Structure formats: structure tokens, C-alpha cells
């Protein structure tokens, strides 16, 4: 078979027409060392701080150290297959995670990949993990309550939507229990919740998922898990990933609550990464920017105004404010709140709930110390009825603590002192609350009203909890309309006070407990 010259030239012309002569520019570097999840790369002149670097085997690294002739990056995943001499490439992208409604009810890792065995997450939205917090001009003051359903918190240390309230205390004294109760209490309120587990056992996270599912709270919750077996890099970025997921709701005029459990372990992970990157250590071997590690995260929790939401959504959402409330958790060692990380986070947040081991061991749970606990902005957001009735509770407890110490040495006490001690004991007993037994505004108001107006004074201390249970049961069965009215309005006036008085006196008269 012979081809004519014209056929040959035709074939060549077709090949030339189909030839792709576009040039793809790649910034390429060589890996010179890999150890403990840290790679040092020679080259990559165009890399920027925080950029994702493509490594062999579909693994990415995060550029953290930019030196004159090399780049120090932390590997986000498995690094055993990476060896000296392998190539690394710039991507021109910073780390992003999937965000949106599709993540609700799911358990994801620090990169947003599902780890609950329920298939892929279908979402069209993604967001960078590092974002600049809204400026002062876009913020709105905190004036809406975020009810936790816990008597001692909502009455004495109220939390507002858009606030940062630290939960601080030693290990195993109920810090996570408070956060989980707060998430469960948001059921039916429209508040979306994100729970970020940092450096915890996988079994503990599985237990939390089970508890949330049992109480119907998983439907409005995203769980971001960086377990103890995950690399330090994933534990370091997990809070930022969770925060981006919460900002999705905040920026669209919705309310969100995020729990960081706990930021002590994130600081440990960041310290490990920094020391491996040969950054100079400072106090307690932490790097110099450990304050910025937490401040840039917690400043993203805010209440934003209508203009911000309208501008962000290009006019699709109008007249709505958005909020992201943060509950960071810090673990102390032997109650030492003057250590480096606790003092940093206390100075960043808008208040703290301080839990004490001695109170926990004495049976007071939640073990909140009302003297050390404070909410700097929550008072303006507190529900009116709880604010009015809760003031006497804090005063009664403060007087009780002072007199209790004095009464141990004094043998003869006058009637007024004895009365204050008796009331303090009963108020302390009233503030005990089991986990998963959060209260509505109306039921909490009933308990506070009974304590504030001396209805508990005639009871034995052991009768306080049974009386409260009977009071709540009576209110829900016989006075359901009053309960619904208080839950809806949250107001307090002479008429509401009279209704509360009727319910409490009815319960005392029946002695149903």
C-alpha cells in the first residue's frame, strides 16, 4: 500500500492542528528531609505562608516555615511513603474545608472528610480555614440570650449569642458535660452547633455522638474530630476548620454555637509542630505566637449586624443579624489558672465558668465556683425573668460562702446569720442538676422564684430536689398555659410574679414530694 504525498501532508496538517502547545508552569521543589511529620523542601521560591503543597501519593503539606533557600511544611496525613529526593509542587491554594447545611448530623475529620461511614457529603460550598475576623464596624452588641438550660449558668453566668465564654477546670470535673448540655438545649431554637474534639480518644467521641443522637441533638450538630491518634497538624487545624463551618451560618444571618474541646491540647499540638520546625521556644516551651494562635480563632466568634449579612449574601438576606458563640474549654493542672495558656485564653474571652475539683467531689454538680466565674457581656443578653429572679441567688451564695467559713469557728450564731446559712445551703442544693436534664426558661424561673422568696427555707436540705421535681411536674401538667407564656415572652411583671406564686404555693400546700 502506497500513500501519495498529498495524503501524507494532509495527515501531518491534522496532527499539527490537534497539537496542544500550551505550557503549564509549575513551581517545583525537592524534599531534602522528612521526619516526625515535617518535610523540608529545597526550592519552591513562589510558595506563600499557609499554602498547600502537593506531596507524593495524593498527600498535601502546609507551608509554615519560609526560609531563604528552603520551606518547612507539616504533612496533613500519612508521610511514611515520602522519601528524600521526592518532588513537591506549589498549588497556589490555601487550605479549605467543605461547609454548609449538608454537614449537619455528620462526623468529619479536620479536613472535612466524613468519618462516620455514611457516605460522601454533598455540598457545593467550601471555605478557607483561616479568615480575618469581622471588624468593629460590622459587629453588633450582644443582647440575645443563649440558654444553656443549666440553672447556675443561666442565672449567674449568662451567655449571649456572639459571646466567647471560657469553661475552665481540672480534668474529669464536668467541662464537656456542660458543653454537651448546652448543645442539647439548642434543640428547636434554630441554633446550629459545632463540636470540635481535639486530641480525645475515639471512644470518647463515639460516646458523645451516641449521647447527642439519643437526645435528638445530632440533627443540628456537626462534629469535627481530631483524635489522639491523628497527627499534631490535624489537631492544630481542627478548631479553625470547625470555626469556618460555624461562620457559614453566622454570615447568612443565622445563629451558631461552637465548642472547642479543648484548646489546651491544640496548644500542645502547636508547640510540638513549632519545636519540630526549630522555632525558638519561650515560656513553658511554647512558641512566641501561642497567644495569636487562640486570639485569631476566638475573635471570629462574634455577632454581626444586618449590613454585614446583607453585604455577604449580596442582598439575598436582609434585616437579619448573625452570630457565632464560642465555648472554648481549657484544662488546668491542679487548679492552676495562672499558667500560660489559661491566662491567655481568660484575657481573650468575654468571661469564664470556673469549675472546682473540691466542689465536684463534695457532690455539687455542675461544680461551678460562682466567686471566680464571670460573664462580662452576658448580663445585657440575659432573659428578663431570669435576670430579675437570679440576682438574689448570687447574693445568697456570696453571703453563704462568707458566713460558712466564719461559722466553723463561732459557736453562738444570731438568728439572722442562721437564716442566711440555712438559705445558702438550700440554694446550693437547688443549683445541683443532673446531666441531660436541662430546663426551660419557665421551669428555671419557678425554681429561682421559690428560692428567692423563701419557700425553700422551711424544707429540709434533702427535700429541696424532690420539691423542685414536684413543682416542675405540677407546672407542666396543671399550669401549662403559664409555662408556655413565660417560655415565649421571657418577661417578668407583677402578673407573672402572681402566677409563679400561685404555682409554688399550690405545690407546697399539696406536699406532693
Swiss-Prot record:
It catalyses: ATP + H2O + 4 H(+)(in) = ADP + phosphate + 5 H(+)(out). GO terms for cellular component: plasma membrane; proton-transporting ATP synthase complex. It is a peripheral membrane protein. The keyword Phosphoprotein does not apply. Transmembrane segments: none annotated. It comes from the Bacteria. GO terms for molecular function: ADP binding; ATP binding; proton-transporting ATP synthase activity, rotational mechanism. Keywords: ATP synthesis, ATP-binding, Cell inner membrane, Cell membrane, CF(1), Hydrogen ion transport, Ion transport, Membrane, Nucleotide-binding, Translocase, Transport. The record marks 373 as: Required for activity. It holds the Pfam family ATP-synt_ab_N. It is an enzyme of class 7 (translocase). It is found in: Cell inner membrane. SUPFAM superfamilies: C-terminal domain of alpha and beta subunits of F1 ATP synthase, N-terminal domain of alpha and beta subunits of F1 ATP synthase, P-loop containing nucleoside triphosphate hydrolases. ATP binds at residues 169-176. CDD domains: ATP-synt_F1_alpha_C (cd18113), ATP-synt_F1_alpha_N (cd18116), F1-ATPase_alpha_CD (cd01132). Its EC number is 7.1.2.2. NCBIfam families: atpA (TIGR00962), PRK13343.1 (NF009884). HAMAP family: ATP_synth_alpha_bact. Produces ATP from ADP in the presence of a proton gradient across the membrane. The alpha chain is a regulatory subunit. F-type ATPases have 2 components, CF(1) - the catalytic core - and CF(0) - the membrane proton channel. CF(1) has five subunits: alpha(3), beta(3), gamma(1), delta(1), epsilon(1). CF(0) has three main subunits: a(1), b(2) and c(9-12). The alpha and beta chains form an alternating ring which encloses part of the gamma chain. CF(1) is attached to CF(0) by a central stalk formed by the gamma and epsilon chains, while a peripheral stalk is formed by the delta and b chains. Belongs to the ATPase alpha/beta chains family. This is ATP synthase subunit alpha. It comes from Francisella philomiragia subsp. philomiragia (strain ATCC 25017 / CCUG 19701 / FSC 153 / O#319-036). The lineage of its organism: Bacteria, Pseudomonadati, Pseudomonadota, Gammaproteobacteria, Thiotrichales.
